[in-house]
Amino acid sequence: MSPRKTYILKLYVAGNTPNSMRALKTLRDILENEFRGVYALKVIDVLKNPQLAEEDKILATPTLAKILPPPVRRIIGDLSDRERVLIGLDLLYDEISEEMLGSAELDTLADDDIASPDS
């Protein structure tokens, strides 16, 4: 099995609002359960650092951006749906691909063991 990738994420919020805090809590729960030890999360308050939001072309909050590994992906708005967050950032796809790769290798081995009718 290959080493796990490191995920670099940025969460853009607007102040200490209930919506911002809910987005942060949900995201931290997802990351700690699914990616413990292989992620870095930077929380950016666009009210305190508007230049960062402008540089990254952030127009709405909350916005979650996966910076690494490429490609960059963004989710804008509600982050309460775990599956939506993982799919939107291509994180669930990576997880499923690794699981399926293991299964595909087993299927290939099994197919090779089956004798053809010609033999």
Swiss-Prot record:
Pfam families: KaiB (PF07689). Keywords: Biological rhythms. InterPro entries: Circ_KaiB (IPR013474), KaiB-like (IPR039022), KaiB_domain (IPR011649), Thioredoxin-like_sf (IPR036249). The keyword Repeat does not apply. One of its GO terms (biological process) is circadian rhythm. Belongs to the KaiB family. The kiaA gene has been eliminated from Prochlorococcus during genome streamlining. It has been suggested that the central oscillator in Prochlorococcus does not have to be as robust as in other cyanobacteria because the former live in specific niches of the Earth's oceans; they divide exactly once a day and at the same time. Thus gene loss and changes in kaiB function compared to other cyanobacteria, can occur. PANTHER family: CIRCADIAN CLOCK PROTEIN KAIB2, KAIB-LIKE PROTEIN 1. Has 2 forms, fold switches to a thioredoxin-like fold (KaiB(fs)) when bound to KaiC. May undergo a major conformational rearrangment; in the free state forms homooligomers. When bound to KaiC switches to a monomeric thioredoxin-fold (KaiB(fs)). The active oscillator complex is probably KaiC(6):KaiB(6). Component of the KaiBC clock protein complex, which constitutes the main circadian regulator in cyanobacteria; it may modify the ATPase activity of KaiC. May be a metamorphic protein which reversibly switches between an inactive tetrameric fold and a rare, thioredoxin-like monomeric fold (KaiB(fs)). KaiB(fs) binds phospho-KaiC, and perhaps clock output effectors. This is Circadian clock oscillator protein KaiB.
